[in-house]
Every structure is written in structure tokens, then in C-alpha cells.
Amino acid sequence: MGVRSPLSASGPRGAAVLVLLLLGVALCSAVEEKKVCQGTNNKLTQLGHVEDHFTSLQRMYNNCEVVLSNLEITYVEHNRDLTFLKTIQEVAGYVLIALNMVDVIPLENLQIIRGNVLYDNSFALAVLSNYHMNKTQGLRELPMKRLSEILNGGVKISNNPKLCNMDTVLWNDIIDTSRKPLTVLDFASNLSSCPKCHPNCTEDHCWGAGEQNCQTLTKVICAQQCSGRCRGKVPSDCCHNQCAAGCTGPRESDCLACRKFRDDATCKDTCPPLVLYNPTTYQMDVNPEGKYSFGATCVRECPHNYVVTDHGSCVRSCNTDTYEVEENGVRKCKKCDGLCSKVCNGIGIGELKGILSINATNIDSFKNCTKINGDVSILPVAFLGDAFTKTLPLDPKKLDVFRTVKEISGFLLIQAWPDNATDLYAFENLEIIRGRTKQHGQYSLAVVNLKIQSLGLRSLKEISDGDIAIMKNKNLCYADTMNWRSLFATQSQKTKIIQNRNKNDCTADRHVCDPLCSDVGCWGPGPFHCFSCRFFSRQKECVKQCNILQGEPREFERDSKCLPCHSECLVQNSTAYNTTCSGPGPDHCMKCAHFIDGPHCVKACPAGVLGENDTLVWKYADANAVCQLCHPNCTRGCKGPGLEGCPNGSKTPSIAAGVVGGLLCLVVVGLGIGLYLRRRHIVRKRTLRRLLQERELVEPLTP
């Protein structure tokens, strides 16, 4: 059946619909574009001079509607204009009002304090010591007339001698008493001089003088049927359970504020997910209606200077196990492959400017570094110490900090190394030497006068600029086997490999490349130090063959690399010709270790996975371990096909129904028996009366 577009309707009705649609669009835009501000976490710290402190406060909250962290109003002088605070509607953290001398703080549109962060670990609202030392000036009014909800945390009001009407506020209607929050209410001593609530205020609850400051109660007046807030006393006035601070109607789109997330004009438990399970392709597809969570709001795009996490949240910085990257124009937090990058200054840069060598004083600054901006120079003075600068000798164990380094932007110069070390083990993960600065303007790699037997730089793949010098290392072998040209980025780069151990002596002592290494050389002994492999490679080791038909773990071969099969692939041992997998991932298995879901091997069939139209996808495994869709009426999974496969419901409702039914039957039977006995009694009584009457008629008269 066709549906006529409201925009094509004619006459007044069509015009009215058009106006309503336009208003709806405008409303959604307004909701979506609420201005947010970061907030502060300074507590009672004053930011410079009092004038600068106020300017910072004004700049932060001007036109702000949603505060992402804490709202801290402190050190405001008398006669300051704070009208810029009127726009604030929501605070995610706590509200701190302290050490102010101003008469009025007009937070008149503040509706909700979420309390995600609490002041002093206890309070979502703290109003403290707002007065001048002479007590002639101080905070007198705090008209938060729309504040209806504090989701977490208590209230502390203390030492405000001029502040009125805090005692006339029904705080139990605002705070979540079920959490038993700490509440400290120390009201002013001169309450008798404070203005009374307007006569129209409910039970004399107000934020100040006048009817406009009456407190609107949204919880204690609610009917028992209400699960949260309400707008009146009857059951039909209950708010939706996603509402916070009250509502104008029963729907989730009628909330004054949202308990968890706001999606356009609707309150929801979660934002629309970014991906959904596709039962046709058996994969997770991008949800065109998906949104990111930004504070308590669902947004199409994260704001400027925010990055996106895997969970679909907008954050200011990535976690320590992720790094920031741009993909398709979106800044994302991507899982690090191993240790996350940490960039450190090298010799000659920043705090190490003017330093000649790595030493016991500065080596700890390279801990967990993956990239060094600058140079790395290890000179003999490092292990000798320096009496003049009172620098102790370097502990050789400290050199392990360089195991995380993958890139050096300058040069690597090593003129001293532990005598018992056979190679440059600390730099085994170094991949690139950029050579943007060079030793003596020429060398980007220099290894001189060491006792090592091999270089051991097995991860080095590129020397971008500069020459190399491997000199005067009397025990060093392998260096002249390398095809250094394959590491260079320019044709002008040169090598200087002289005065190391004689090649014939190296061969005689079997200090030669492993047979599994290719002819382009090696960094040291064994299959782990090959520059490239003759046959296949498994991670950093050269091997003769991959574990395709036997061995653990089972593998497949690609580009001369042995790569592991997915863990959901069933290992094949039945014949000598069966491979376990043909490629990466769970969709290239020859057989599945557990179950099959479409083309994929899975550990378990989908159970309650979110699919299209917010429906949950449930599947069961058939006799062939293939995942099949449950019957649509099986809303909690199934064990087989059809309705018969649905799990039996909980026995508790059945027992309850049986008990109620049994009691009802007893009542009915009891009533039936009672009625029967009563009727029988009435019949007997009537019979007896009739017999008596008949006896009177036939009885002879006595003379």
C-alpha cells in the first residue's frame, strides 16, 4: 500500500504538517547542536590573579549548555556579572561553588548533575564558605529552580552565613536516596531574615522569593506505579524510565533530561551501535544509523580534537595500549601491535642538548621508547663514570632499555660495550636509522673498537642516509657477509668495514651464516640472524618448510612466510594430503574445530547478537555442527529447530500459576458446597414449615 508524503498534501492540513515537520527538524538540530564545554578540575586552586581567574571562568562557560567534567565557580568578587552561567543545563561531574563574595549565582537553567566525578569523593553539589571575612558580603541567592536530579553523589552546604532558602529545598526529591549519599546541610544561622516561599509553592518548598522560584517536585509526589520521575500525582503522569529531572509526557521523547544517553530528542539506554550482525553474510556490517557516544549524547561525528575508540566513544586521548591514527578522515584509537610508540629525545635534543654520551644519569629517560628523535652515542666514559660531573659508571644491565627502540632519527655510534657481550643485543629490534644527523657529518652507523663477535642487528631494514663504519672490532665476524646496499636508500651511501676479524679465522671457528640463510648474508649465528631466508620464514626464524601437513601449530604458506592457521580450524591428521587451512582467518579452514556459521568457523553459534532493526540473533548447532537460525518465537535462544527447540520457560511462573489456580479452585468448590448446604437447609426449613401447617389443619379441636 502506498503512503502519501505529507509534503505533497494540499490545503491547510498539508501546510500544518509541513510546519510541524520543519519545527521537528529545527528541534532535532537544536538538540544535536547543544554547545558543550570541557569544565575544570582545579578544586579550590586560584588560577593566577583574581581578574585572570574570573576571565578564565567567563571564557570557559560563556554560552555553554553541557559541562563535560566539573563546574567550578570559585573566587568571584562582589558585583561581578555571572549571567553567562544561565545557559548551563547539565553538568557531567560535580558542581563546586566556593569562596565567592558575589550576591547571586544564577544557575537557573541547570536541570541535572550527573556526578560522574564527585567532589571530595562524596559530593555532587558543594556550596562552601561563600562570604567575605567581614561577613558583610557573600552569597545570598542560589536560584537553581530547575535542578530536579542528582544522579550520583550527595550535597554539602556549609559555612554560607548570607545564603538563604537552602533549607526550604526538599533535597530528597533531587538526590538518589537509594544510593545513600553523604549529605551535609549546615544552613545559615539567620534564617528568620530570609524570604518566605510564595504561598503557591508546594508544601513551602522553594529556591527563593517569588512564585518563579518554587521548587518543582518530580519524585516524592509520584504514584506508586512510577519507576522514576513524574509530572503529577496520578499514574498517567509517570515519566518514561529513561527520563531524568522530569518530563512533559509519558514517552522517552518527552524527557527534560536523559538518564543515560540522548539520541536527537529521544532518551535511550545506549547509542545506536556502529555495527550490526548480518544474518545473510554472517558478518558484522556497518550500521548506517550508528552513532558515537559523546558524554551523555549520541552524535554522528565526534567533535573536533576528539578521537574515536573501538567501542564508539569520543575521547580526548587514546588508552596506553592504543595509538592515534587517521582513517578515512576520522581520527581513531587503533590497537597497538605490541608496545605502543613512545617518542623520546636523543643526544643533542631537548634535555640532552650538550650531552656527549648515554650515561647512568640519562639512560632511564629512554625507558619504553620506540622512537628516538636525535642520536644515540655510547662512549667509553659511559662505563667509566665521570668524577668531575659525579656521574657513576653505567650498569650494563641498563642497556636493556633500548630493546624497545625501533627507529633512530639521527645516528647510532657505539664505541664502548660490555666486554662479555657477544653482540649488540640491546638493539635487536631496531628497524630504521634515518641518518638525519650524522657523526662527523658522514656516518649514520658506527661500531668501533668493541669485543663483540657479531652485530646482532637482525631487525634492521633501512639506513636512510649516511655511511656506515664497522672498524677495529677484533672478534667481529659476519659483517662482511652482508649486502649493505640493500639497506641503503641512496646510491651515494658507502661502507667502511675494516680491521675486524680475519674472514678465514671466522670460517675456521664456524662463525659463518646458517645454511637456512640466503646468500645475502646474516647478522650473526643461527637461523634467527639471517638477513633473508633461503626457504621459508616463521616470524624471525628461517625454516626449511612450513607446518602444512604436520607439526604444531599448523600453517599455510604465503610469500615464503609460514603463517598460522586460525585457532578455529580443526587440525587435519587423517591423511598425508590434508591441509588444515588455505589462508588466514576462520573462513579458510578445511574443517572447523567447533561450529560453522555460514562460511566462518566459530567457537560458538551467535547467541543474542544484535542484528537488524534492534533484533537479537539466536542460533543453534545442528547435528553437523552448522549454526542454524532459531524459530522467531524463541526469544532466549534454542536447542533445536521449530518451537520445540525453544527452552522451557522458568518453572517459577508455572508453579505460581498452579498455586493461584489451585487456590481459585478451592474457593470455587468451597462456595459451591456452601451454596449447596444453604439451599439444602432452606429446603428442609420450608418442608418442616409445610408439615407443621398441615398438622395444624388436620388436628381436631379440643373441647
UniProtKB/Swiss-Prot annotation:
Signal peptide: 1-30
Catalytic activity: L-tyrosyl-[protein] + ATP = O-phospho-L-tyrosyl-[protein] + ADP + H(+)
Chain ranges on the Extracellular side, renumbered to this chain: 31-654
Cytoplasmic compartment spans: 668-703
InterPro entries referenced in this protein's UniProt entry, alphabetically: Egfr_JX_dom, Furin-like_Cys-rich_dom, Furin_repeat, GF_recep_IV, Growth_fac_rcpt_cys_sf, Rcpt_L-dom, Rcpt_L-dom_sf, TM_ErbB1
Subcellular location, record wording: Cell membrane; Endoplasmic reticulum membrane; Golgi apparatus membrane; Nucleus membrane
PTM remark: Phosphorylated. Autophosphorylates.
Residues bearing attached sugar chains per UniProt: N134, N190, N200, N359, N368, N420, N573, N578, N613, N633, N648
A molecular function (GO) term: ATP binding
The protein's Enzyme Commission number: 2.7.10.1
GO CC, alphabetical: endoplasmic reticulum membrane; endosome membrane; Golgi membrane; nuclear membrane; nucleus; plasma membrane
Residues recorded as bearing Phosphothreonine in the entry: T687, T702
Record keywords: ATP-binding, Cell membrane, Disulfide bond, Endoplasmic reticulum, Endosome, Glycoprotein, Golgi apparatus, Kinase, Membrane, Nucleotide-binding, Nucleus, Phosphoprotein, Receptor, Signal, Transferase, Transmembrane, Transmembrane helix, Tyrosine-protein kinase
Pfam families according to UniProt: Furin-like, GF_recep_IV, Recep_L_domain, TM_ErbB1
Disulfide bonds: C37-C64, C164-C194, C197-C206, C201-C214, C222-C230, C226-C238, C239-C247, C243-C255, C258-C267, C271-C298, C302-C314, C318-C333, C336-C340, C344-C369, C477-C506, C513-C522, C517-C530, C533-C542, C546-C562, C565-C581, C569-C589, C592-C601, C605-C627, C630-C638, C634-C646
Documented activity regulation: Endocytosis and inhibition of the activated EGFR by phosphatases constitute immediate regulatory mechanisms. Moreover, inducible feedback inhibitors may constitute alternative regulatory mechanisms for the EGFR signaling.
Its biological purpose: Receptor tyrosine kinase binding ligands of the EGF family and activating several signaling cascades to convert extracellular cues into appropriate cellular responses. Known ligands include EGF and TGFA/TGF-alpha. Ligand binding triggers receptor homo- and/or heterodimerization and autophosphorylation on key cytoplasmic residues. The phosphorylated receptor recruits adapter proteins like GRB2 which in turn activates complex downstream signaling cascades. Activates at least 4 major downstream signaling cascades including the RAS-RAF-MEK-ERK, PI3 kinase-AKT, PLCgamma-PKC and STATs modules.
The protein's assembly and partners: Binding of the ligand triggers homo- and/or heterodimerization of the receptor triggering its autophosphorylation.
Similarity comment: family membership: Belongs to the protein kinase superfamily. Tyr protein kinase family. EGF receptor subfamily.
Name of the protein: Epidermal growth factor receptor
Native source organism of the sequence: Gallus gallus (Chicken)
